[in-house]
C-alpha cells in the first residue's frame, strides 16, 4: 500500500496534468494528498480542487506549517512517495516492482534513462546498472541518488531516522535528506525496465530557485495559469513520450480545451 504526497506551488496546469496522469495510468496509490504551499493564485487552485474531488488538498503558507504537514503525513503512513507538480506519468508502473519494500523504488528510472540533467541545465550520459536492482552507493548520478522527492517509494521507517533537521520547502527537504544519505538504511534501489514517470522542467515558480528550467515564455507559470483559467488543459494523449531518456526532460507541452480523462 502506497500513499502519495504532491508538492505544489502556483502551477495549476501542471498539477492538474499530474493528477490526471495518475488516474489515466491507474497508478495504485491508496491515497493522494496535495500540499499546496505558498500559492498566490488560489482561484486556480480552487479549480484544480473542484476537478479532483477524490484528492485531499491541504493549503499552507510559511515554512513551519509546510514542515508540520510533511511530518504528519510521514507519521501516519507506512509506505510513501513524493511528487513535485511538474511531473507526469506516461505509463502504468509495474505493481510487482512497486511491491518491493526493502529497497527504494524509482518510477523515474529505467534502462531508458541514459541521460542525467545537470545543475547547470545541460545533460550528461550516465551509466545504467546492468540489472533492475542495484546498490545505489556503487551507482552513477541519478542511479546513485536514493532520496529523490520525485516518484521514489520509501518506507517511512527508513526516512524518519534521517529527519533531524528543519525544512521549509521541497528543495530543503530533498537537499537535507541527500546530505544524510549515508545513514539511509536500504542498500538497494529498484526500477522497471522502462521508466513510467518523468519531470518536465519547463519552468520554476520561484526566481530564487537554482534548479535548471526551460525558457519558453509560453510555458512559464503565469502564461500557463492564464491558459488554465481559460479552460485549456495538458493533452496527455497528444504529448510525445516515445523518447523519454532521462528522469527530467523538456518534453513539449500540448494543450486541448477542457480535456477530461
Stretches found by the model and what they are:
Residues 151, 157, 161-261:
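C-terminal catalytic/acceptor-binding lobe
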Residues 35-79:
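Active-site-proximal specificity loops/subdomain of glycosyltransferases
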Residues 13-15, 39-47, 96-97, 114-115:
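Short, charged/polar "capping" segments at the starts of alpha-helices
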Residues 20-30:
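Short, acidic, metal-binding catalytic loop of nucleotide-sugar glycosyltransferases
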Residues 78-88:
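Short beta-strand-to-loop acidic/aromatic patch adjacent to the donor-nucleotide binding site
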Residues 97-166:
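Conserved catalytic core of nucleotide-sugar-dependent glycosyltransferases
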Residues 87-98:
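Acidic donor-binding/catalytic loop of UDP-sugar-dependent glycosyltransferases
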Residues 1-20:
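N-proximal low-complexity "stem/linker" segments adjacent to membrane-targeting elements
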Amino acid at each position: 500500500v502506497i500513499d502519495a504526497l504532491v508538492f505544489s506551488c502556483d502551477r495549476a496546469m501542471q498539477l492538474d496534468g499530474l493528477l490526471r496522469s495518475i488516474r489515466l495510468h491507474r497508478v495504485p496509490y491508496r491515497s493522494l494528498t496535495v500540499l499546496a504551499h505558498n500559492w498566490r493564485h488560489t482561484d486556480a487552485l480552487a479549480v484544480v480542487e473542484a476537478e479532483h474531488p477524490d484528492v485531499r488538498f491541504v493549503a499552507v503558507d510559511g515554512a513551519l506549517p509546510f514542515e508540520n504537514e510533511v511530518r504528519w503525513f510521514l507519521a501516519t503512513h507506512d509506505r510513501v512517495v513524493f511528487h513535485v507538480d511538474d511531473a507526469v506519468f506516461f505509463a502504468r508502473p509495474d505493481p510487482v516492482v512497486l511491491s518491493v519494500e526493502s529497497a527504494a523504488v524509482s518510477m523515474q528510472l529505467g534502462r531508458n534513462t541514459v541521460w542525467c540533467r545537470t545543475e547547470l541545465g545541460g545533460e550528461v550520459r550516465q551509466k545504467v546498472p546492468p540489472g533492475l536492482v542495484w546498490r545505489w552507493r556503487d551507482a552513477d548520478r541519478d542511479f546513485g541518488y536514493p532520496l529523490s522527492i520525485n516518484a521514489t517509494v520509501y518506507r517511512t521507517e527508513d526516512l524518519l531516522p534521517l529527519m533531524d533537521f528543519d525544512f521549509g520547502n521541497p528543495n530543503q527537504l530533498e537537499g537535507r535528506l541527500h546530505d544524510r544519505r549515508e545513514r539511509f538504511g536500504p542498500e538497494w534501489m529498484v526500477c522497471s525496465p522502462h521508466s513510467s514517470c518523468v519531470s518536465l522542467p519547463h519552468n520554476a515558480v520561484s526566481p530564487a530557485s537554482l534548479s535548471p528550467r526551460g525558457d519558453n515564455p509560453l510555458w512559464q507559470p503565469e502564461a500557463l495559469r492564464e491558459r488554465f483559467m481559460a479552460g485549456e488543459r495538458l493533452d496527455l494523449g497528444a504529448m510525445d513520450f516515445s523518447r523519454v531518456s532521462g528522469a527530467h526532460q523538456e518534453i513539449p507541452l500540448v494543450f486541448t480545451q477542457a480535456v477530461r480523462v
